[in-house]
Amino acid sequence: MRKLSIPFLVASAMLVLGIVGGLACDERPERPIVHRAGYRVLEGDFHAHTAWSDGSLSPLGIVRQAARRGLDVVSITEHNTVLPSRAARWYAELTGGPIVITGEEVTTARFHVIALGIEHTVSPDQPLEDVISKIHSQHGIAIAAHPVQHFWPSVLPHRSEFDAAEVMHPIAYSERSADWRWADMVRFYEESPTPLGAIGSSDYHWMSVLGLCRTLLFVREPVSEAAVLEALREKHTVTIDREGKAYGDKALVAALRDEPYVPRTSDYAYRGSSTADRILRTLGWLGLLGVLLLRARAKTPELTPESPEPDS
C-alpha cells in the first residue's frame, strides 16, 4: 500500500474543510408562514432536472438550491426515471430541507408528462393513456408538461385524463417557434372540458433559475408530503404569470385578489457571504487544486538516466 504524502493529506484536509464549512455557511432564506382562505400557502417547483441527464446539479444540489431559493416544495422530475428524486427526498429528510415530492418526466417525442408522488419509474414505451393510468395506479399526479401545440396531436384527446397542466413555464419568457408558444399552454389549460390544476414550473436544467415559475399550494396543516399531494389532487393550486394574472382554483384566485400574495421569486444569495464562508470556500478550492495536481504528479513516471553499458 502506497504511503500518502504529507502535502496530499494537507490538501485533502483543506478540501474536506471547505466542503463542510461551505455547507455549514450555506444561505437558507427564511420561509415565512402565510395563510390564505384557511389554508397554509406553500411555494413549489415541480419540474427540475439533474446532472443525471441534461441538468447541471446533482439531486442533492437541487435540494440545496431549492432551499437557497426559498422554495417550500420541490420535485425532481428526471427524464424517464424516478431514482434521482428518491435520493433527493432522502437527503432533504436527513438535512431538514424543503419537502421533496418524488417524480419523473415521462418523455417521448410525442408527449411529456410530469408524474408526481410515484415510487416506481413509469415507462415511456406505451400509449399516453397507459402512461397516465400507470401514474394513477401509484396514486400519483399526472401533469401535462409544457403543453404547446407541438404536443397537441397526442395530448388533446386525453386532456381530461390529466390532473393538472403547466400554465407558467420559462417558455413564457422566451418562445422558440410557432408551435412552442406560451399562449397555447394557457389555451390548453383554459379550454379544458374538465377543470385542471394550474401549475407553474421552471423546467430547471442549467444556466437557468430554479423557482423562476412557481406553484402556490393551498395546503391543510400540518404540512407534509401527503398534504402537498392532497392539495395537488384537489387542484388547490394557483400560478401567477409574468403580468401578475393568477390562474387556478377560482375561490383561491379570489382570495388572493382580496388579500394579495407576492411569490418569493426575487434572487436570493447563492452562497454564504460571511468572511468565514469566503475563507472556507477558498481553502476548499485550493485543496481540490492541490489534490488534482498531486495525483497527476504521482501518476507521472519519473525519468532516470540510463545506466552506462559495461565495457566489453
Positions of predicted regions on the chain:
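Charged catalytic cores and adjacent phosphate/nucleic-acid-binding surfaces used
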Residues: 2-44, 109-120, 150-312
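An N-terminally biased module of ancient metal coordination in phosphate/nucleic-acid-related enzymes
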Residues: 16-110, 306, 311
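Short, flexible loop segments at the rims of nucleotide/cofactor-binding pockets, characterized by
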Residues: 49-54, 118-122, 143-144, 173-177
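Non-catalytic positions within long, well-ordered alpha-helices that form the structural scaffold/packing
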Residues: 67-68, 136, 158
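Conserved beta-strand positions in the central sheet of alpha/beta enzyme cores
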Residues: 75-76, 143-144, 166
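Binuclear metal-dependent hydrolase catalytic cores centered on His/Asp/Glu-rich metal-binding motifs
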Residues: 112-141
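Aromatic-lined carbohydrate-recognition surfaces of secreted/lumenal glycan-active proteins
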Residues: 136-151, 245
